[in-house]
Design a protein with these regions (language model features):
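Charge-dense, helix-prone N-terminal extensions
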Residues: 2-215
Length: 215
């Protein structure tokens, strides 16, 4: 048993090493760009939205005294051209980096970004590329299936009922972190069918009953 466990451990460490190398390569391969204004970013997207795989946007911290586009402005322009925000990274004492990338096929919409996109359409700012992403999402159901952001996410009522039937799982659920709580909510909200949602609920109840989490 020890031998097998040792082999598993080596394999796991090897895979983790590969992931770190890939992340490092990803970091180095994506260009860093700075834009002073929202118009500068919009002009860049007009020329590059269909041929760029994404960028790291350098954004100045509020108290830095530097002038750059801010995150909210960047997100608005990104949505207009069918792009979306991804993760962020610290860079220096005065700046941080926000990743913006083209929206992947079939990627889910958050309710916040759906509302922002709707407002951009109504104000006449939405560009053809962004409108095409909205139309695709409406056609395949992703628009109506938009999920809550972490700040607004509520535990689905049917999952609360399942928790009430399992005191042990419920007690552990009440102790888990906000990240783990949202991970469960997000997976339930984004289930494409009722059968998938029910299966996920059963899986999560069993997981919580054993004192385990997704992260």
């Amino acid at each position: 048993m020890e031998g097998r466990g040792s082999v598993r451990g080596k394999v796991a460490r090897r895979e983790e090493g590969k992931k770190k190398k890939k992340a490092a390569a990803d970091w180095e391969s994506v260009p860093i760009r700075a834009f002073k204004t929202q118009k500068d970013f919009a002009d860049w997207l007009e020329k590059n939205h269909s041929k760029s795989a994404g960028i790291w946007m350098r954004i100045a911290k509020k108290d830095s005294g530097k002038k750059t586009i801010n995150y909210a402005e960047g997100l608005e322009s990104a949505l207009c051209y069918g792009w979306i925000d991804a993760h962020k990274r610290p860079e220096s004492e005065s700046t941080w980096l926000q990743r913006f990338v083209p929206r992947r096929p079939k990627s889910g919409w958050s309710k916040i970004n759906r509302d922002k996109a709707t407002a951009l359409v109504e104000s006449g700012q939405m560009r053809p590329a962004g409108l095409a992403e909205i139309e695709r999402a409406r056609a395949d159901g992703r628009w109506d299936a938009a999920y809550d952001s972490p700040a607004r996410a509520q535990v689905p009522a049917e999952f609360l009922k399942e928790l009430d039937r399992n005191p042990r799982a419920k007690a552990f659920f009440e102790t888990i972190s906000r990240i783990n709580r949202y991970a469960i909510i997000w997976r339930l909200q984004t289930a494409k069918t009722a059968a998938t949602r029910e299966q996920r609920m059963r899986t999560f109840i069993e997981m919580l009953e054993k004192g385990k989490t997704l992260h």
